[in-house]
């Protein structure tokens, strides 16, 4: 019944008004920015096929690196709810997770330059394990952002906010695909050639080793400012509102 009430309230908003409500929520903008960076990260990891083929000279390694990403992510997703409870919220978990991810990707860079593939696989898995909690609690974070909009502006935007978060995915995915193509073209890469110029090989290293690390650092910076749970509690305490407000609205 409360859910129907929320939907009715949201239906009264025009597209422009809903957009203004979302833009005024700094935490929502942070989530969108993080989504875009995640998609750019994924695009560079996907471009790893070029790196495996031309730098490591074994395109079959791409499948192994895919496993090194996916298995730790699944493990992290399983344990995320427990860790959220243990650390009393998502902020600390997300921060610690991405600190681990940054360390992992930094060590991937080191292992890449010394040419140690087993170490690259291990540190890729470490980075993925650190990224998992954020992927596991994203929806809960969006719910907290929606609560922040209600607390600060008195408006329900739950449905709109969930729908619009796909914006970051679409924008990031489109930009990521385009950037991969542009960078490879600028480097002088020609797919039909049996050999590639050094400029292309250097670009492949930059795209697969350095850009994912840079994107993880940027995401960590954003997450360090995304303590929306604490902000919501501060506002509710200031106004004398119960902590179970989400169940009442």
Where are these predicted regions, by residue range?
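C-terminal ends and interior cores of transmembrane alpha-helices
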Residues: 99-115
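Loop-to-transmembrane helix entry
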Residues: 54-72, 119, 199-207
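Residue-level signature of mid-helix packing/kink "hotspots" within the transmembrane helices
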Residues: 70-78, 174
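Helix-to-loop junctions at the C-terminal end of transmembrane segments
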Residues: 75-92
């Amino acid at each position: 019944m409360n859910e129907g009430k929320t939907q009715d309230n949201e239906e009264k908003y025009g597209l422009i008004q809903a957009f203004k409500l979302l833009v005024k929520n700094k935490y929502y903008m942070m989530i969108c920015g993080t989504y875009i960076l995640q998609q750019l990260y994924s695009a560079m990891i996907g471009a790893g096929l070029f790196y495996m083929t031309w730098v490591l000279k074994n395109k079959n390694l791409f499948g192994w690196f895919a496993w090194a990403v996916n298995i730790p992510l699944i493990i992290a997703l399983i344990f995320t709810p427990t860790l959220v409870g243990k650390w009393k919220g998502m902020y600390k978990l997300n921060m610690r997770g991405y600190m681990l991810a940054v360390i992992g990707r930094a060590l991937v860079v080191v292992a890449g330059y010394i040419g140690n593939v087993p170490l690259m696989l291990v540190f890729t898995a470490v980075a993925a394990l650190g990224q998992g909690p954020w992927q596991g609690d994203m929806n809960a974070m969006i719910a907290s952002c929606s609560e922040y909009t209600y607390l600060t502006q008195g408006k329900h935007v739950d449905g709109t906010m969930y729908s619009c978060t796909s914006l970051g995915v679409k924008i990031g995915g489109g930009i990521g695909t385009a950037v991969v193509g542009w960078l490879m073209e600028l480097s002088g890469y020609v797919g039909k050639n049996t050999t590639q110029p050094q400029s292309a090989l250097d670009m492949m290293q930059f795209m697969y080793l350095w850009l994912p690390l840079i994107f993880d650092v940027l995401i960590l910076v954003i997450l360090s400012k995304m303590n929306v749970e604490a902000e919501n509690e501060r506002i509710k305490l200031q106004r004398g509102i119960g902590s179970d407000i989400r169940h009442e609205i």
